[in-house]
């Protein structure tokens, strides 16, 4: 009986782990510092000084298919159009931190 109970418990734990949404082990506070030093000159307050219609506000991120950590990480890493790539300047974990910060701020309307 104990063996069956242990197996059931293990199965539940594995199922929960396998189907839980993948969370970034990101440091939002560090992301805020990195954003301030590297991104705020063009994106202060979630705005976009180069392409005004493509802000970092939640509705614009959703509209342009950028409302996910993966999309933001790809954009910051590789750059696009006027936005430079940060691949050589920031480490992958720093870019993850920035993505977590941007998504958190977007959820709070950058307030």
Swiss-Prot record:
Its main location: other. Binds 1 heme c group covalently per subunit. Keywords: Electron transport, Heme, Iron, Metal-binding, Photosynthesis, Signal, Thylakoid, Transport. Pfam families: Cytochrome_CBB3 (PF13442). GO terms for molecular function: electron transfer activity; heme binding; iron ion binding. Residues 1-26 form the signal peptide. It is found in: Cellular thylakoid lumen. Heme c binds at residues 39, 42-43, 83. It comes from the Bacteria. InterPro entries: Cyt_c-like_dom, Cyt_c-like_dom_sf, Cyt_C6, Cyt_C_IC. One of its GO terms (biological process) is photosynthesis. The keyword Thylakoid applies. GO terms for cellular component: plasma membrane-derived thylakoid lumen. Functions as an electron carrier between membrane-bound cytochrome b6-f and photosystem I in oxygenic photosynthesis. PANTHER family: CYTOCHROME C6, CHLOROPLASTIC (PTHR34688:SF2). Belongs to the cytochrome c family. PetJ subfamily. Monomer. This is Cytochrome c6. It comes from Trichormus variabilis (strain ATCC 29413 / PCC 7937) (Anabaena variabilis).
């Amino acid at each position: 009986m104990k063996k069956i109970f242990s197996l059931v418990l293990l199965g539940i734990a594995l199922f929960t782990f396998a189907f839980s949404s993948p969370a970034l082990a990101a440091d939002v506070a560090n992301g805020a510092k990195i954003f301030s030093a590297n991104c705020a000159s063009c994106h202060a307050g979630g705005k976009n000084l180069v392409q005004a219609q493509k802000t970092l506000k939640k509705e614009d991120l959703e509209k342009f298919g950028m409302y996910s950590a993966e999309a933001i990480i790809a954009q910051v890493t590789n750059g696009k159009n006027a936005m430079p790539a940060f691949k050589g300047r920031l480490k992958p974990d720093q870019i993850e931190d920035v993505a977590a910060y941007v998504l958190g701020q977007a959820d709070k309307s950058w307030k």
